[in-house]
Amino acid sequence: MSQGQERFLNYSQLLSELVDGRGRTLNDTTVAFLYQLFPNDLFVKAFSLLETHNLFLYVWDSIDDVALNDGVQCSDAEIDETSNSVAGSRLPTEGHQCHSKRNSNDNDISRLANMLYDLETRSKTLHRIIVQSVDEEVSKKPIYVDVTAWFCSCNEYTKCFSGMLHNNGDEGYQGMFETYGNETDDNFAKVNSHTHVNSSKVICQHLLAAAILLQTSLKVLKYFTSVKQSVSLFSINNKDDWLKLHLNIVD
Ligand SMILES: [Zn+2]
């Protein structure tokens, strides 16, 4: 993979300051700065997704074989097979108002959020982010975001990505990536241990919203899922439900 250009701004650190130290209120100064940092009202749109109950985060949470085959250790999880499973009716389907608008209970949200930020479990915990299309978008199909691979299924991302590839050739490909001169704790748009995607060039509102949740800090994730409760966080511990979740998105 290309070395790309050097990166200086620690986005994870900066976006972590979206909320105060206790994670209870927004830091208005940081919010105002971030409005300016991202182009084309991207931060406004992403922030809107986080505040308007349109983003759903599903976490595979089971000692069942899918997790075990992937090496997941659900060490701190008291698995309860009877609760918090996502029923079929709450899974996204094209053209429907999908999902329950309520989260799991507070303890469960906290435990799931911890799994997504725990150094031992975060890279092994399967998760899926789905964004419900809003009215002004042409397609009513739910949008699938894979923040780990820095991928989004929306048209905005596809245009952005193909534009970089086709308009600039090899130079465009190299321009997609950034590296740090030194070791960094910046996880924002990170695709491997040495490489970050150039998030000023390859990004969309859904990826930015997802990265704010999963690539900043635990207090930010808990702010939107537990304090403000504007992002729904569900556990899935049933393979059929997990497959339905995929089948509804992948044609
Ligand atoms: Zn997108």
Swiss-Prot record:
Region described as Disordered: 83-105
Keywords from the named record: DNA damage, DNA recombination, DNA repair, Nucleus
Keyword Nucleotide-binding assigned: no
Subcellular location: Nucleus
Any single Gene Ontology cellular-component annotation: nucleus
GO BP annotations, alphabetical order: DNA recombination; DNA repair
Superkingdom field: Eukaryota
Predominant location: nucleus
Main function: Plays a role in a RAD51/RAD54-dependent homologous recombination repair (HRR) pathway to repair MMS-induced lesions during S-phase. Required for error-free repair of spontaneous and induced DNA lesions to protect the genome from mutation.
Family the UniProt entry places it in: Belongs to the SHU2 family.
Name of the protein this chain belongs to: Suppressor of hydroxyurea sensitivity protein 2
Species lineage: Eukaryota, Fungi, Dikarya, Ascomycota, Saccharomycotina
The encoding gene: SHU2
